[in-house]
Amino acid sequence: MAMQRRRLGRVDYATTFDAMRAFTETRTPGTPDELWLCEHPPVFTQGLAGKAEHVLDAGDIPVVASNRGGQVTYHGPGQVVAYPLIDLQALGIFVKEYVFRLEQAVIKTLEGYGVTGHRVTGAPGIYVNLCDPFGHGALPGPPDPRDPWRGIGKIAALGIKVSRHCSYHGLALNVAMDLSPYERINPCGYAGLRTVDLSTIGVPVDPERAAADLGDRLESYLSP
């Protein structure tokens, strides 16, 4: 069965969370996989590992508890959020391989814009070398224990939930957004981690195009 792609536009986070959870709870072996692409109004979301101390000053931005993995992150306009609703058992892969494919889809999307995306062991998501986001060298290292994130910027966040072999939640790619809300949190629980978007590193991409490109990559990596 072909994956169904849905472009939701700008939608409330909590409403979307409830909808994808309901979809996952009621789907059957015959339900086609879906890929939801959207953006959210400003919101902080806390994953299952989230700690209150990592929300430094939420201010007027709501904080919503979520059942995805990970800690606190931010969603807002100018960010492409992708929610793949996938039957992993039918696809024939386990969670570790699923996460690898999600990250690979982001890496290949960035590659299309000339940007080199990197994985960081133990820190899900995709990162760029702030000194040379277009080069093919490794990230700066070894890390300085006083500033372990020096020279590294996070450009995509990832957090998933798997229930009855089926995934929901997903990933967020920063395209052209107001990044100042990230200063109100320790992104993903990491103090000092800088968050960037494509615009910050000199890649002027329209979020609609980025959503289409990311959607294409996700479909290619998550289809049988």
Swiss-Prot record:
Residues 29-224 form the BPL/LPL catalytic domain. The keyword Transferase applies. Pathway: Protein modification; protein lipoylation via endogenous pathway; protein N(6)-(lipoyl)lysine from octanoyl-[acyl-carrier-protein]: step 1/2. Keywords: Acyltransferase, Cytoplasm, Transferase. The keyword Acyltransferase applies. It is found in: Cytoplasm. Its main location: cytoplasm. One of its GO terms (molecular function) is lipoyl(octanoyl) transferase activity. InterPro entries: aa-tRNA-synth_II/BPL/LPL, BPL_LPL_catalytic, Octanoyltransferase, Octanoyltransferase_CS. It comes from the Bacteria. HAMAP family: LipB (MF_00013). In the reaction, the free carboxyl group of octanoic acid is attached via an amide linkage to the epsilon-amino group of a specific lysine residue of lipoyl domains of lipoate-dependent enzymes. This is Octanoyltransferase.
